[in-house]
């Protein structure tokens, strides 16, 4: 899985690879991240490779994985039911999906990361996964440079 942690330098949003699962968990579960509001949480990108200078902005090289949000309206009467169904739904399709990660998002749903299907664009991969899982395609989240605010495991 391609996982890049986002950081800022001189006002520019840069990214560097996460070394391994241990580092990923340390970043995600750090005390600073436990007390942060959503917009100050650790940010990750799973869908692209950084530019030569490490910058995220304008990145065009696809990684081998795709990050996707599965979100629901918390005000909907069936919100809790839908949230409870997602883990079983995703895990039931993990082989076909090429699932690499499933985690709760900071607000109203889940993040998944899956293997990129060769020959499909980012948007086509997201639409394919949405159809496979029977969840709504998020039209606003199709850019490869999309970042994911990553909450600690206890949120």
List where the protein language model places each region:
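Short glycine-/aliphatic-rich beta-strand segments at the starts of folded cytosolic domains
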Residues: 55-81
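Long, low-complexity interaction regions most often at the N-terminus
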Residues: 2-3, 13-16, 96-97, 122, ...
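A broadly used, surface-exposed interaction patch
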Residues: 38-46, 53, 74-95
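Helical (often loop-to-helix) elements that flank the catalytic cores of nucleotide-handling enzymes
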Residues: 78-93, 114-137
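Catalytic micro-motifs at enzyme active sites that drive phosphoryl/nucleotidyl and oxygen chemistry
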Residues: 53-58, 87-106, 135-138
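Histidine-centered divalent-metal-coordination microenvironment in nucleic-acid enzymes
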Residues: 67-68, 96-121, 125, 146-151
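DNA replication initiation on ssDNA origins
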Residues: 1-64
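Catalytic "initiation/cleavage/transfer" segments centered on a nucleophilic residue
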Residues: 118-119, 133-155
């Amino acid at each position: 899985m391609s996982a890049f942690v986002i950081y800022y330098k001189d006002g520019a949003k840069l990214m560097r690879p996460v070394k391994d699962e241990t580092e990923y968990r340390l970043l995600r579960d750090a005390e600073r991240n436990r007390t942060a509001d959503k917009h100050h949480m650790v940010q990750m990108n799973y869908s692209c490779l950084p530019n030569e200078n490490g910058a995220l902005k304008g990145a065009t090289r696809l990684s081998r994985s795709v990050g996707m949000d599965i979100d629901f309206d918390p005000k909907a009467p069936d919100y809790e039911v839908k949230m409870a169904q997602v883990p079983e739904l995703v895990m039931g399709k993990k082989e076909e999906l090429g699932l690499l990660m499933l985690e709760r998002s900071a607000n109203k749903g889940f993040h998944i990361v899956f293997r990129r299907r060769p020959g499909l664009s980012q948007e086509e991969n997201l639409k394919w996964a949405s159809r496979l899982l029977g969840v709504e395609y998020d039209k606003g989240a199709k850019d490869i440079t999309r970042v994911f605010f990553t909450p600690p495991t206890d949120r």
